[in-house]
Every structure is written in structure tokens, then in C-alpha cells.
């Protein structure tokens, strides 16, 4: 029975603790160096900024082409679909409905 426990004990032998070769090439690995280093001098940065300013100016000028809204295109009163509403009668119905709710509250026991 002692022979079965040998496989689970920790060992300092590099052959036993070798990393799995199947996972070596996945996701993470040693970083590689770029073959051509890029030069980031101040002269290049300044030219990039001027190009960005030109783009921003073009965007600001493009917003002035909006025409005002024509009031004849606005449709009003479509929610009622042509029905005339008597607001006095509707308010009276709401008051009547509120009274029915109060009666239901009296029967409620917490």
C-alpha cells in the first residue's frame, strides 16, 4: 500500500515536475521584441495634433446644415384617435373608482 502513495508525494525531480507541453504554447508565453523599434519624437506628435484639430473643425462646420422643423409636420391629438374627451366626466369617473378602492382596503388584514 505504501507504493501507491509515492505518485502523490511531492518531488524535486525536474522530470516529474516538468510543465505540460500541451499548455506551453497557449495564451501566455514569452514576449517577443518588435523587429523595428518605433521612434516617438516630439516632431511626430505635433504633426498628429494638427491633423486632429483639422478633423474637429470639419465636424463643427457640418452641424450647421440642419433645417428648422416645419410646424405642418407635427401631428397633434393622435393619441385620442379623433375622439372628443369630456374631462369633467372623466374626472367624475376617477373619483367614483377611488371610492371603490377604499372599500377594498378595509377588508385587508396584514
Swiss-Prot record:
Forms a chaperone-bound H2A.Z-H2B complex that acts as a source for SWR1 complex-dependent H2A to H2A.Z histone replacement in chromatin. It is found in: Nucleus. GO terms for cellular component: nucleus. Residues 1-14 have a biased composition (Polar residues). It comes from Aspergillus oryzae (strain ATCC 42149 / RIB 40) (Yellow koji mold). Transmembrane segments: none annotated. Residues 41-64, 97-110 have a biased composition (Acidic residues). Keywords: Chaperone, Nucleus. It holds the Pfam family CHZ. Belongs to the CHZ1 family. Its main location: nucleus. Forms a heterotrimer with H2A.Z-H2B, stabilizing the association of the histone dimer. Also, with a lower affinity, forms a heterotrimer with H2A-H2B. Residues 1-110 are annotated as: Disordered. InterPro entries: Histone_chaperone_domain_CHZ. This is Histone H2A.Z-specific chaperone chz1. It comes from the Eukaryota.
